Structures are given as C-alpha cells and as structure tokens.
C-alpha cells in the first residue's frame, strides 16, 4: 500500500490524503474553513493519476493520523448535528 498527501496552494485550509491499494484510491479530504467538512471516498481507474499528479509520498503513520482526525471530527459533527 502507498500513501500520499496533497495541499491546495490556492486554499491552504484544504488537506488531502490518499492511500492506494488494489487499484483503488481512498481519498480523505479535510477542509478547515467556516464549516469543517470531511470527505472520505474511493476512486478507481484513470482518475487516480489526476489525483496523484501533485501529491507527495508519506508514511503510514502520517496517513493514520489523518484518519484519526477524521474519526474525531465525525464524532464531533454527529454530536453537534443531533444536539441542535
């Protein structure tokens, strides 16, 4: 398995992390802005190259940290949603 990250220079509040395994790219995107948004989805096929074009390789530990941030944010967002 390979791990990557990419930051949007135009929007530094967006952080993107990817893991590539078995021809599928798992994308974890964290947006820190007025509303924190977390996206977690998979991409297959030719689109993978587009996503990895400006990405740099990272280690598993860094990717796992991004996953743990997402897990914590999802818990917080769910809690806030159900307690409005």
Task: Report the location of each language-model feature.
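Acidic, low-complexity, intrinsically disordered interaction modules
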Residues: 12-66
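Charged interaction segments
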Residues: 56-84
């Amino acid at each position: 398995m390979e791990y990557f990250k990419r930051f949007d220079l135009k929007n530094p509040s967006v952080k993107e992390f990817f893991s590539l395994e078995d021809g599928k790219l798992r994308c974890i995107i964290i947006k820190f802005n007025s509303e924190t948004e977390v996206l977690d989805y998979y991409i297959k096929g030719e689109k993978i190259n587009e996503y990895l074009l400006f990405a740099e390789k990272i280690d598993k530990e860094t990717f796992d940290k991004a996953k743990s941030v997402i897990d914590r944010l999802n818990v917080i967002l769910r809690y806030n949603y159900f307690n409005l």
